[in-house]
Amino acid sequence: MRDELLEPTLQELLGLQRRPRWRPYLMGIVNATPDSFSDAQGTKSVEDRVELARKLLADGADIIDVGGESGITNKPAVEVAEEISRVVPVIEAIAKLPGAVVSVDTYKPAVARAAIAAGARIVNDVSGLLDDDLAAAAAEGNAAIVLMHTRARPKEKRFPPYDDVVADVKDFLADAVNRALAQGVPLEHVIVDPGPDFAKTPAQTIEVLRALDQLHELGRPILLAASRKDFVGALTDRGPREREAGTLAALAAGVDHGIAIARLHDIAAAADFLTVRAALSGELAVDDELALAEHKRRIELVSEA
């Protein structure tokens, strides 16, 4: 397991402060799409999305991940120009917020270049580096890149057979890292993602997450994107917007396995969960004078009269 969640070089590149091991960097999600599977925010305008980002930052987010194409498989891919028009105004505005570190969720090199020019510091690739030029775009823009495991193309729902899904994830990501390095990305700028749900059945995803420790053999920080995923729904028999408790359980397991970044919808719940968990485990010191503010002690009943 890594001594630091992120190396000082990557912390400096992204402008992030050091975090203790019990509290990974939290990546809040802002969808610049009309069709996200789990977006209940009603965030349709640039202003709406900036306000959501502001709230996520106030709730404890370290990074804001902006995406212009949803992962819904029964919808066509978004044209490059349309995706750029969705994400660039949002990224430009969020990047101006105090303390905001912006990531762009895209697999298209042209979108990545436009997003980096607009202020994104991370390229979050969910295609498994389908196009090596995406890594070149990150290198040119001095941005970090997240490389995710998947054996399916974007927008494709596919569950290929695996002889050993854990070994496949490790080998795939090792190859993706080497390809990124060949495009000029410094090793210190690479983050890996096991890709829960992507080209994996719920059982296969669970198998990979149980073995998350093995990904430390790659020598790179791990991003866990388990928020509201189908494997959580399969275990709990709940729809996307009802999976927060299951998401927090997955987050806890990820922290135990040494993840560096957690990509989440509900940042406030995750931050509170991690704080209480660390206090009870002894990882977070608790002042003897700790007390609850009186106005937060109970719900005030408001008369209907």
Please provide the spans of the model-predicted regions.
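Hydrophobic "anchor" residues on beta-strands that sit immediately upstream
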Residues: 27, 61, 101, 121, ...
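Active-site-adjacent loop and "lid" segments of alpha/beta metabolic enzymes
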Residues: 2-15, 21, 36-52, 71-93, ...
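Catalytic domains of carbohydrate-active enzymes, especially glycoside hydrolases
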Residues: 51-67, 257
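Phosphate/pyrophosphate-binding loops at sites that engage ATP/ADP/AMP, CoA/4′-phosphopantetheine
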Residues: 57-58, 176-189
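Active-site metal-binding loops of divalent metal-dependent hydrolases
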Residues: 196
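A short, charged/proline- and glycine-enriched loop
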Residues: 23-25
